[in-house]
Amino acid sequence: MDSLWRETVKLPRFEPLEGDFTTDVLVIGGGLAGLLCADQLTRAGVDCALVEAERLCGGATQNTTAKITVQHGLIYDKLIREFGADKARLYLEANQRALDQYRKLCQGLDCDLEEKDAFVYSRTSRKKIDRELAALERLGAGAEFADNLPLPFQVAGAVKFGRQAQFHPLKFAAAIAGRLNI
């Protein structure tokens, strides 16, 4: 299956590296993680270069769901049970900071950033949803129950997080790449 994102944007192409060069930091890999690392280093004034063997965002990034959210599956109940509420809260807070940082990074970029609600559902177990919602309430997260989703099948319930986001990851990557030494 072809990437929806790759079909709707043309990423910049770069000539193969010829000869030696000097840099303080070399970032290897031109996926979203590599681009963001190189961007943050460059913004901090670090002499940085990024190298990619194939093409920018040719791996996982081109097939992403493109959602930017603090909810990645039914994870918080499990985190509390396995690691405790303090560590689960740290995970939640780190994801919230990442969401906020993406919003800042997207300002002024043509990347189709939209505020969206995020849902994680269970087709069969309302109990799983209730446990997740109880865990999120314990952590102070603003999630709520939903069961009327625009899906072609019934669900037992869903965790709904408001004010999450979605964007065009390759438009974002192209904008970031344009200001880097690649």
Model features per residue range: what roles?
Residues 66-70, 162:
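Short, hinge-like loop/turn segments at secondary-structure boundaries
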Residues 1-25, 43:
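Extreme N-terminal leader/targeting segments of oxidoreductases
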Residues 21-50:
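N-terminal Rossmann-like FAD-binding beta1-loop-alpha1 element of flavoenzymes
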Residues 71-147:
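Dinucleotide-binding Rossmann-like beta1-alpha1 core, especially the glycine-rich loop
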Residues 133-137, 158-182:
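Helical element adjacent to the flavin cofactor pocket in flavoenzyme catalytic cores
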Residues 60-62:
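Conserved catalytic-core motifs of eukaryotic protein kinase domains, centered on the activation segment
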